[in-house]
Amino acid sequence: ADVKKITETVIGFFEPKKGKCPAGDEYTFLLNVTSNAAGGLEHANSTALAAPRKWLPCTHDKKRTDNYVQLLTLFAHEYFHTWLVKRIKPAAFIDADFSEEAYTSLLWLFEGFTSYYESMLVRRAGLIDDEVLGKLLSKDLKAVVETPAHMAQSLSQASFDAWIKFYKPSANSVNAHVSYYRQGALAAWVLDAEIRRKTKSLSLIHISEP
């Protein structure tokens, strides 16, 4: 039921008039339960997810636990990619040759904005409250500020260098490379706040509306 609420909310975000997913009536979530690993990989009509067993809900839980909320945001993140990345994508990803790297300086937008909305849309679906949303955003802020590299590398550089740095971490990564996921999410948060401040009535979420 919770995942259904998420999919309906994401569809409403991108398709307020049509009310349908571009993948059609069938979309498959493949969840692999692990000991510790977590992540996801989006496809045009499905997504492959990995989540620790502790993220799964228990029948005796009286409320959604922090671990379960992480699972919900993972579902939201990968489903959001059905539009942003699979349908709306950087030029380098169009007709890309998957046997080699595809470089782009825009990963911070595609992954960062998705990371921001994974929390915002779970909140919009009514699955968390404002307090929990604030904790999720603050967690990203804390992680970025405490990473020395956030003052040494731009988001566009972090995106372009992903193949040689982000995906090949070293002992010096904390000093040399930022997460375009988390720092990109903060960029979306700041942009959203600035739009709200200046317009008094609009927000970043209005980009989904005609």
Where are these regions (language model features)?
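Juxtacatalytic substrate-recognition/specificity segment
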Residues: 1-107
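Surface-exposed helix-capping loop/turn segments at secondary-structure junctions
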Residues: 12-23, 89-91, 123-130, 195-202
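Feature representing long, continuous alpha-helical segments
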Residues: 74, 135, 182-189, 193
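Hydrophobic alpha-helix feature that most strongly marks membrane-spanning transmembrane helices
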Residues: 84, 88, 146, 168, ...
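Acidic/His/Gly-enriched intrinsically disordered linker/tail segments
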Residues: 88-97, 101-182
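Short glycine/serine- and small hydrophobic-enriched flexible loop segments
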Residues: 116-123, 186-197
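Residue-level detector of conserved catalytic or cofactor/ligand-binding positions
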Residues: 202-210
